[in-house]
Amino acid sequence: MTTQKIVPTKSTDGSKLFRHQAKFVAGAMNINQILNFSLPEIAFVGKSNVGKSSLINTICNNKNLAKVSNTPGRTRQINFFNLADKLIIVDLPGYGFANVPISVKEQWGVLISYYLRNSYNLRLVNLLIDSRRGIKENDKKVADLLLANKREFQIIFTKSDKVTDHKNLHDEAQNFLATLNYSCNVMYVSNRSKEGARELKASLAKCIKPQK
């Protein structure tokens, strides 16, 4: 399997792209339901209740786009959202949630792993980490999977308004990346204060196809 490199766009800040309204286009509860949209895809992955759906709603300026719940494990399928026929935003089920049957956790694991390994159109993965919890073993396993499949990814610390010192997070991320021999963006975002939203949009806008 081959992947294509991120191609810079004319819009450097992403604001023009994200003025458009994103819409839900499909959900996949098993690998046979995963569709090929022939558009660049950017995925959000992380532990249950890390804030994936809320972050998607924040950058798309629509609090009702992706279903949000305070109960971990509510996203039980891969959800696909079309942004202006230029980009597919992918909300993956959370991992590491204990209060579901083992069979369900295994099903989610297979679904997440299959998508990350096999999506031809996947351009960038956003690995979301709860700022209050730091990088955990499951996060490291996902990063290993991404590297093994030559996937571009960046680290997004969510709920950054809940911590007062980002330096420890930065040091933790850099030490983690050093063990992987990998370099990438490290961002801090807050759905409440909107910190980091503009920078995140800019990084995602670089993934769309160049205008002809």
Curated annotation (Swiss-Prot):
GO terms for molecular function: GTP binding; metal ion binding. Residues 38-210 form the EngB-type G domain. Keywords: Cell cycle, Cell division, GTP-binding, Magnesium, Metal-binding, Nucleotide-binding, Septation. InterPro entries: G_ENGB_dom (IPR030393), GTP-bd (IPR006073), GTP-bd_ribosome_bio_YsxC (IPR019987), P-loop_NTPase (IPR027417). Mg(2+) binds at residues 53, 75. GO terms for biological process: division septum assembly. Pfam families: MMR_HSR1. GTP binds at residues 46-53, 73-77, 91-94, 158-161, 189-191. Its cofactor is Mg(2+). It comes from the Bacteria. Necessary for normal cell division and for the maintenance of normal septation. Belongs to the TRAFAC class TrmE-Era-EngA-EngB-Septin-like GTPase superfamily. EngB GTPase family. This is Probable GTP-binding protein EngB. It comes from Rickettsia conorii (strain ATCC VR-613 / Malish 7).
